[in-house]
């Protein structure tokens, strides 16, 4: 059904109320070919596009998410590209922040690029802390950049973000 719409909107799972949308979120990401916004179960107000943070690791999923989010990025007052520096983002073959910044500039979207080292903190916590510190109103990211099996066994950024998010998350795969 999601294939027939520009965007799907799904509420975050809420264990307290017995709502588990993780299967629906995964199915929408993998099978619809369309982006989705996952809304935190604590969300009370309407979607605000004041400040958008885009996670960037140079992956296909990140490229897809940023390009699918172009209509929203154009409406934002501020757009930030956030890079958690690790082995993957340090690789010369990965499209760097300046290149994707030039791409967005061709769409009349100005960005600020922020980087932070991965250190000993897991990536989802780094991202969520940055989103809170920057007062972002929307997070854009690629969803499930690794195989579902790897994400299930080892965990991953997508699962970590979806379990503890406090702002809506725009995702594409």
Tell where the protein language model's regions lie, with residue ranges.
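Charged helix-capping and loop-helix junction motifs
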Residues: 22-24, 95-98, 128, 153-158
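Short Asp/Glu-rich motifs
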Residues: 21, 48, 92, 123-124, ...
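Active-site proximal loops enriched in glycine and acidic residues that flank catalytic Cys/His/Asp
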Residues: 83, 115, 142-143, 171-173
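Short, small-residue-enriched loops and turns at beta-alpha junctions
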Residues: 16-17, 87-92, 118-121, 147
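Short glycine/serine/threonine-biased micro-segments
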Residues: 53, 140-143, 153-154
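Redox- and metal-dependent alpha/beta enzyme cores, enriched for Fe-S-associated oxidoreductases
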Residues: 58-110, 114
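Intrinsically disordered or low-complexity boundary/linker segments at protein termini
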Residues: 1-82, 163-173
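Structural beta-alpha unit
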Residues: 1-8, 106-139, 145-150, 159, ...
């Amino acid at each position: 059904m999601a294939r027939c719409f520009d965007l799907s909107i799904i509420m975050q799972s809420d264990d307290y109320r017995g709502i588990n949308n993780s299967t629906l979120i995964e199915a929408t990401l993998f099978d619809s070919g369309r982006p989705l916004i996952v809304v935190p179960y604590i969300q009370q107000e309407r979607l605000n596009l004041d400040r958008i943070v885009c996670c960037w690791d140079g992956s296909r999923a990140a490229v897809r998410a940023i390009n699918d989010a172009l209509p929203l990025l154009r409406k934002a007052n501020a757009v930030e590209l956030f890079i958690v520096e690790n082995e993957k983002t340090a690789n010369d073959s990965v499209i760097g922040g300046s290149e994707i910044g030039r791409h967005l500039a061709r769409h009349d979207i100005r960005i600020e690029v922020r980087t932070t080292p991965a250190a000993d903190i897991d990536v989802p916590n780094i991202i969520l802390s940055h989103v809170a510190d920057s007062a972002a109103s929307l997070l854009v990211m690629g969803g499930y950049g690794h195989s579902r099996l790897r994400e299930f066994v080892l965990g991953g950024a997508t699962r970590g973000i979806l379990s503890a998010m406090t702002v809506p998350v725009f995702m594409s795969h």
